Each structure stands twice: as C-alpha cells, then as structure tokens.
C-alpha cells in the first residue's frame, strides 16, 4: 500500500514540478520505483535461497532413525516435532515409531490420539481411562511425602487415579487434592524384559529404577501419563526422549538415559546419558542424512548453523570421545573425519564447538588435522576480534 502511495506521490510531483503530462509522469515514476524491488531482490536473494538445503526433512528423519523398531519417542518443542511428523506423513519414514509431544500430552484429545493405532505404530501403553484424564481431572498431582520411604510406582499411580475421597485428603489441608504420598518412587524391572531391551548385555542392569521427585511440587498430566506408560510398557517397546527435550520433562529418569544418536533411550541401568557406541556409530555413519549442509554454496542461516554446531558437539565429538575411552581409535577417527566431511568449515565455521574435535585428533595422533582445526578456530576468532575493534564505542 505504501509503495503504491509513493509511486502516486512521485507521479504527482513529476506532473506538477516537471511539467509532464499524467501518462508520462506515471510511467517515469513506475520505472524509477521498479528499481526498489530489484535492489531488494539483488541484495537479499542469497540469504533467502534455500535451494539444495533439506535440513528440516533430513534432521527430522535422523531423530526417527535414532530409534529401534516400534519405538516411542518423546519430543517437546516445534523443531523436534513437526519435522518428524513431516518425515512420517509425507516421506513415509519410520512410521513404526510413535512421536509423542509432551506439551500436547497435557490435553485429553491428544491422549485420545495416542491410544489409537497410527500406521505401523500400535497404540501407546496408556491404561488411564478417559474419565480419569479428561480436561479438568488430574491435571496435576501434588508431591506430598507422607512417608520417608520409597513406594512402588504402580502403587503411586493407583493412588492418584483412585476416586476414593480418602486418597484425596492431605493432613492439615481441607481441600481434596490429587497427590502422591511420597517423593521417592521405584519401578521394579522385569529381568527378562530388561535383558531383551539391553540386547542381552546385562552388565550393570538394575533390578529397580529409582524415581526421585524431591524438589518437585507436582507432576503434570503429561508426566503422570509417561510414568503410566513406563509401568505398563514393561520395556516391550523401546522408549526414547529427543536430546532437545528440556530436562524438566524427564521425570527424573535421565539417570537411566543412554544416547543412541539424536535421542536418549530409557534403559534399566545407570547409564547417566552415556553413549551406546555400537548403536550411535551405526546411526551416525550409516543411517543419518545431512540435509545438504555438506554441499558447497548451500546457504545456512543462523538457525541451521546452530543445529549444525550442536551436531558437531553432541553427536560427533561425544561419540568419538566415547569410542576413544573404549579403545576403538579407528572408529573414533572415522567419526571425526565424517564430521569434517558433512560439516565442512566452509559451511559451518570452526569455533569453540570444534575444540574437542581438534583435541581428539591430537589424542589419536593426527597432529596435522588437529593443527588445521586449531588454526582455523584462531583465525576465525581473530577476524571477529578485528571486526569488534572496528566499532566505535
């Protein structure tokens, strides 16, 4: 609208002060103003050109490929949910995996969806009936420890889901509330199911998983539903959290997380977010796709750049470090080389996220590659410093 007003005003000015007839004045004004969008396109074309870049599709697929068949993966935000849905709904990628967004899991309509079949994914193992989770019912359960002892997870969930008034009364509080009478819960691990989910590697497997709720005022509906799934599932289906999920959604299960790629698998051992090198190596080296960020000339905006640098740290460096600790130096070197191949410095500049890359190269005896990385980091930092010093105080 304002551009149109500007053209009209310029035409009027030419007509009045240039003594031009209306047709010529309008034509001249139009031609002159055409240079404005041409200039805008010329200056902004490069940083709006997404040709050759398929990061959203491929990175979304990578989350799904981090999971075992028939898995459940919990996500939280838009960027770790919508790309996964696109990959499944449009590209048909890993439709056996059920994506469950914890933000939506606070609503009854979404829980209804999760209890239905979706493609090859069976309904989620949720035992709560609709009248027990309908909106306005059990939206939260307060953590009110009436005992210092830990109680069984199943007992705690049955306590919350009961409609018996005696389970709603807290000493000293007149109002009836949904609550959990302990801040320490435990889940008994079925040894057969636990061994199966660990692939027969039972070293370190625990007989019960402790869930410490100390410091939490309440559990939301989504957390109660996740705990119900943990109890009901009995490790029949692999359960994962996307690595981008906020820790406050973990229900304090992160001590039992094992990284397999872009996801943490819930396992019956004190993994503490350690890397499962076998699974993660296979995913990173053989299954993951890179969205074209490895191609010369592909424009990478600040959001994609941030994700790529996170990949460098959370995937490649972490996996290589774990492989070095296990004495698998050849594989660690392959991982580092893969990192430099798919996240080339021309597209993803070297900065603090590459420090560990250089250190690991040095540990592996690749001093020239290490020096090249450290030199690249230093050069980029000096360019930044010089640019800052050009600014007036």
Residues covered by each model-derived region:
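Phosphate- and divalent-cation-binding pockets in alpha/beta enzyme and binding domains
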Residues: 82-86
């Amino acid at each position: 609208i304002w551009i149109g007003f500007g053209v009209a005003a310029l035409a009027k000015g030419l007509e009045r002060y240039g003594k031009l007839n209306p047709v010529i004045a309008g034509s001249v004004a139009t031609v002159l103003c055409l240079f404005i969008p041409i200039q805008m396109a010329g200056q902004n074309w490069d940083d709006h050109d997404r040709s050759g870049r398929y990061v959203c599709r491929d990175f979304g697929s990578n989350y799904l490929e981090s999971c075992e068949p028939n898995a459940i993966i919990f996500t939280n935000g838009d960027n770790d949910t919508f790309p996964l849905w696109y990959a499944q709904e449009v590209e048909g990628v890993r439709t056996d995996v059920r994506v469950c967004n914890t933000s939506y899991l606070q609503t009854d309509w979404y829980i209804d969806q999760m209890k239905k079949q979706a493609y090859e994914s069976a309904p989620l193992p949720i035992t709560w009936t609709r009248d027990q989770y309908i909106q306005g019912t059990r939206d939260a359960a307060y953590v009110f420890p009436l005992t210092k002892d830990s109680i069984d997870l199943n007992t705690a969930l049955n306590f919350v889901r009961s409609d018996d008034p005696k389970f709603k009364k807290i000493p000293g509080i007149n109002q009836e509330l949904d609550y959990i009478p302990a801040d320490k819960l435990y889940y008994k691990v079925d040894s057969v199911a636990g061994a199966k989910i660990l692939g027969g590697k039972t070293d370190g497997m625990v007989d019960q998983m402790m869930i410490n709720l100390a410091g939490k005022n309440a559990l939301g509906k989504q957390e109660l539903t996740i705990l119900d799934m943990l109890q009901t599932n009995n490790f029949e289906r692999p359960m994962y959290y996307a690595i981008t999920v906020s820790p406050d959604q973990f229900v304090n299960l992160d001590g039992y997380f094992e990284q397999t790629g872009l996801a943490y698998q819930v396992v019956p051992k004190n993994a503490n977010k350690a890397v499962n090198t076998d699974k993660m190596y296979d995913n990173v080296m053989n299954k993951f796709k890179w969205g074209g960020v490895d191609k010369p000339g592909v424009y990478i905006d600040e959001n994609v750049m941030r994700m790529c640098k996170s990949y460098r740290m959370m995937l490649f460096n972490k996996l290589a470090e774990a492989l070095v600790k296990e004495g698998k130096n050849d594989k660690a070197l392959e991982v580092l080389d893969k990192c430099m191949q798919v996240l080339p410095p021309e597209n993803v500049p070297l900065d603090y996220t590459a420090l560990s890359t250089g250190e690991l190269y040095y540990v592996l005896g690749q001093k020239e590659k290490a020096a090249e990385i450290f030199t690249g980091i230093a050069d980029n930092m000096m360019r930044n410093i010089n640019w800052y010093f050009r600014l007036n105080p």
